[in-house]
Amino acid sequence: PLHRLHDEEVVRLLESGQRREELTGLLGADGYRELSSLAREAAKARHRGGQVVYVLPGLMGSRIGTRGRLLDDVIWLDPIEVAAGHLTRLALPRGSRLAALGVMLLNALKLKLTLQIAGFDARLHAYDWRRSVERLADELLARIESDGVQSPMLVGHSMGGVVARVALAADRGRIARAVQLGAPNSGSFAPVLAMRGVYPTVRKLAALDLRHDAEDLARIVFRTLPSLHELLPDADLTDGANLFDSSEWPDDALRP
């Protein structure tokens, strides 16, 4: 299935025009036209030997599941798994064996291809967005070391920008620059909405889930994720309310 393919495989399909109808269904007509054009242009660009740029997607922007010998078992985000009620497998710590399998491609792939056209050696960096930001920054630094890359740049969207900032602060000698795109450095209300079961994405997932409603998903899954707790808004965004103190939340089953 296309949603299980990695970015290099999708780029090859976009360049060649193969499986056009399926890709259009996945990316939308406008998305397919834009990405196929960018893929062909990037193929002509000389980006080998250019400065390495790691592209980090935002919150919920990486696929989560388990790796298989032939096919990965994708939980986030596979509509069949959602309908079967398997999103509850994402809850922590019970779902600790799950890992990031790749990046949700539409926006991240556009950024990667645009950077390649500009001459950069752009690489997508998937991460398990359920985890703490500090842990994810450490994993990013470990990947950079494993890749043997000297002085890369980081470009992070949303939560990815926060991970990039923390990685830069942890090892300024290793990273040349970090660029943030809409990063919630003072926190965000999105985690609040997710943990209350009213975030639009949670509502859409609940509409597909045949076994759980939005409050179930918030209670069982989203309030167990360290990343959402760490990205809660600072008090200066909440008129002084300290959302890091559970007593400030409604006294119900969804209280963190």
Protein language model features and the residues they cover:
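N-terminal non-catalytic accessory region
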Residues: P1-E215, F222
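Glycine-rich, aromatic-lined ligand/substrate-binding cores of catalytic
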Residues: I220-P256
